[in-house]
Swiss-Prot record:
Activity regulation, free text: Inhibited by E64, a specific inhibitor of cysteine proteases, N-ethylmaleimide, iodacetamide, and mercury and zinc ions.
Enzyme Commission number(s) from the entry: 3.4.22.40
Native source organism of the sequence: Saccharomyces cerevisiae (strain ATCC 204508 / S288c) (Baker's yeast)
Protein name according to UniProt: Cysteine proteinase 1, mitochondrial
Enzyme class: hydrolase
Transit peptide: 1-30
Propeptide segment residues: 483
Length: 483
């Protein structure tokens, strides 16, 4: 019998104390193999339960997502009325297809609103492929640098094994987007689109790059172990490897048409059917037309494992050598919600990261944690957000854009949000989703706002230079890359 709630704390403390001192034989007594005789007993018990019989009949004939969908709840939550929205329509609906570029789409979709407004355009996209190309190139080089800096660790160490797992995966973080734009700028998609196959279906390309990078990792670690290998040898090896990675990339993608400081010419037609010509560079286009000041955006997260009001840094996570580290400010959900409202009121969309597709109905475009009636089959989910993070049940997997919300007049908090995804117009309702506040609280992990939109006490966390961040290892769930 489990202890009462009154004695639970003392019980757990005593249990842990005994467990730490327990010899192996005691631990062995606690193991439990499957008792075959109990299987028949369990089966008879469940077969005599009419509720269980009904549930198993349905689930053996239908997809669980279809069978358990609460359509009454769905109809109630599928409300597309929003009283706080950005003024510019974000068109066309974008589609990352079979690639993990959601973070690049969400970030460029946020900035394209500025271009649409600035140039009086009906439709526009920034080139996601342009950033994708350089992200791959930079990530490969960043990986090689991490291999060199971790050469003192055993090949079987958790760090080295983690680095080797996915050296150039598609996913990323907003700070990694900023690192790319600072170095390479932005260009219109008209100049560099998604035509190469591997841009929109990157699995095989990633596999080949990963294989080559693991080979390079062994070469570097072997060279570093040889006492005769001085710095110049490693530098030469690195340059040879960079060249080979670039060669491989040029096989799968076109080389971007311009250098960051090289001028390009772009012709376009505005809403009034007037033809215009722009001469600009990628770096100038990012600042002049996309209106991006890379020093302004900051990331905030909700991680209930750690104290609120603290900076959190992810060790070794990045893409561009010498670029900014991945740093967040940890805040409560109410603060996140209020900042979303404030930013939307400033006519700016909100980049956010969530655990997708948890509790997301792709057919109708509704995100709600009560959308499926799992309790009807006795399947309950009692874990809280902090526990889900600790036990690898929840993490940020996808980035999207909040372009509107419906604010309650009394609480001044959102009741629901309008979400722009990057899975094409056939996902959700013409590419748009409605997300409930409860979903936001449970499965939203990150938002990006401008530092001047923060209260002074929060902004100072980033600017004072006095805040020592909590440093989490690269494999921590908060270091997950949105795809």
């Amino acid at each position: 019998m489990l202890p009462t709630s009154v004695s639970r704390s003392l019980y757990l403390k005593t249990f842990r104390s005994h467990l730490l001192r327990a010899p192996q034989i005691v631990l062995k007594r606690m193991s439990s193999s499957i008792d075959i005789s109990k299987i028949n007993s369990w089966n008879k018990e469940f077969q005599s339960d009419l509720t269980h019989q009904l549930a198993t009949t349905v689930l053996k004939n239908y997809n669980a997502d279809d069978a358990l969908l609460n359509k009454t709840r769905l109809q109630k939550q599928d409300n597309r009325v929003f009283n706080t929205v950005v003024s510019t329509d974000s068109t066309p609906v974008t589609n990352q297809k079979s690639s993990g570029r959601c973070w690049l789409f969400a970030a460029t979709n946020q900035l394209r609103l500025n271009v649409l407004s600035e140039l009086n355009l009906k439709e526009f996209e920034l080139s996601q492929a342009y950033l994708f190309f350089y992200d791959k190139l930079e990530k490969a080089n960043y990986f090689l640098d991490q291999i060199v800096s971790s050469a003192d660790q055993d090949i079987d160490s958790r760090l080295v094994q983690y680095l080797l797992a996915a050296p150039t995966e598609d996913g990323g973080q907003y700070s990694m987007f900023l690192n790319l734009v600072k170095k390479y700028g932005l260009i219109p998609k008209d100049l560099y689109g998604d035509l190469p196959y591997s841009t929109t279906a990157s699995r095989k390309w990633n596999s080949l790059l990963t294989t080559k990078l693991r080979e390079f990792a062994e070469t570097l670690r072997t060279a570093l172990k040889e006492r005769s290998a001085d710095d110049s040898i490693i530098v030469t090896l690195r340059e040879q490897m960079q060249r080979e990675i670039f060669r491989l990339m040029s096989l799968f993608m076109d080389i971007p048409p311009v250098q960051p400081n090289e001028q390009f010419t772009w012709e376009y037609v505005d809403k009034d059917k007037k033809i215009h010509t722009i001469k600009s560079t990628p770096l100038e286009f990012a600042s002049k037309y996309a209106k991006l000041d890379p020093s302004t955006p900051v990331s905030l997260i909700n991680d209930p494992r750690h104290p609120y009001g603290k900076l959190i840094k992810i060790d070794r996570l990045g893409n561009v050598l010498g670029g900014d580290a991945v740093i967040y400010l940890n805040v409560d959900n109410e603060t996140l919600s209020k900042l979303v409202v404030k930013r939307l009121q400033n006519n700016k969309a909100v980049f956010f990261g969530s655990h997708t597709p948890k509790f997301m109905d792709k057919k109708t475009g509704v995100m709600d944690i009560e959308l499926w009636n799992y309790p009807a089959i006795g399947y309950n989910l009692p874990q809280q957000k902090a526990s889900r993070i600790r036990y690898h049940e929840s993490l940020m997997t996808h980035a999207m854009l909040i372009t509107g919300c419906h604010v309650d007049e009394t609480s001044k908090l959102p009741l629901r949000y309008r979400v722009e995804n990057s899975w094409g117009k056939d996902s959700g309702k013409d590419g748009l989703y409605v997300m409930t506040q409860k979903y936001f609280e449970e499965y939203c992990f990150q938002i990006v706002v401008d530092i001047n939109e923060l209260p002074k006490e929060l902004a100072s966390k980033f600017t004072s230079g006095k805040e020592e961040p909590i440093v989490l290892p690269i494999w921590d769930p908060m270091g997950a890359l949105a795809k």
